[in-house]
Amino acid sequence: MKNINKEQIPFIIMAIVAVLWVFYFPYFSKEFLTEYFYMPFLGVIAATVANTTPAAAGIVYFPILTRLEVQPVTAVQFTLIIQAYGMGLGTFKWYLVNKRLFIFNVIPICLLGGIIGVVVSIVFFPIEKPELLTLIFNFIAFLLTQIIFFSILYEHKYPKLGIDLNTINILILFGFSLLGGLVSGWIGFGIDTMFYFILTVIFRINPAVAIVTSISLMAALSIAGTILNIIFHDVPLSIWYSALPGVTIAGLFLAAYLAVKLGPKNVLMLFTMLLSIDFFVTLWTQNTIPISYTVRSFITYALIIYLVYIHVKIFKQGFTEIGSSLGEFKADS
């Protein structure tokens, strides 16, 4: 064991997972081959998104699975269990890449608030139809993406790498984590996106550090939510099993590699694009709020024109790096 270096560990984990996946294939083969054969490919995309941006895998899984006639409650339960695994792997890989990307002192406080929120939302106040809450969350997240756009356009500085845990800061972190835990228990994701904006907007934390820390928090909270679902509700193991190959590859290898290569600016642009697309898809397909086709089309196309304008303006600005203010994902030396 002493001769194993940290570069070999992901390959060992992947080999173990591959053996176990093949071993359990007879138990899940029918569902995998007839219903969920696409999940490994979707898992690659979702896990890459979840482990490179502050948008959890649920932002990919939830709208797609519900359109494929998976019940929303089942989609939420699946989202938590696959994030517990995939973002857990991603957190471990990021720790191997550069442990200085984590703000360790805030995680216990935020995890406590998040777990309390998850317990309340899953155990005491579960909701059967999370579509409206998803729409509201996506709308708020879309509004918050404007902060990222203007921070890039005006080259805002994010000088801090840590947070002083005084009373006010603890209350802010705990309060928003509690709210994020409630949302995550209901729709399967949310605390990571919320936590990222709190770190960058309120505390001026480097985005690279904020992204990785938010990933670790969502991973830990997904584990807690999954345990609660196992105890009080159901866990869709067949869908989870089907997604494992793609999630393993992305979590252990692809996500961190892409983040390092893309850099913080491009990762943030990817993040804003994903949140925007998710909002558009949710708005266009939702039936919770009655909106006419004309109004829906006008809102969607107006927002698309606005986003195209913003992106063109950013790219015309011509800088490929935003200095050290956004931090770096590069490996720890």
Question: Which residues fall in each region the model found?
Answer:
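Short helix-coil transition sites and intra-membrane helix breaks within transmembrane domains
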Residues: 48-59, 184-192
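Juxtamembrane transmembrane-helix boundary motif
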Residues: 1-45, 66-68, 72-73, 96-181, ...
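Juxtamembrane transmembrane-helix termini in multi-pass membrane transport proteins
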Residues: 58-101
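Membrane-interface helix-cap regions at the ends of transmembrane helices
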Residues: 86-100, 220-236, 286-287
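Hydrophobic transmembrane alpha-helices of secondary-active solute transporters
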Residues: 46-50, 180-185, 217, 221, ...
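Transmembrane helix-bundle signature of multi-pass membrane transporters/permeases
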Residues: 76-87, 211-222, 249, 275
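Membrane-interface alpha-helices at helix entry/exit sites of multi-pass transporters
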Residues: 70-81, 101-108, 204-215
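Interfacial segments of multi-pass membrane proteins
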Residues: 61-74, 192-209, 228
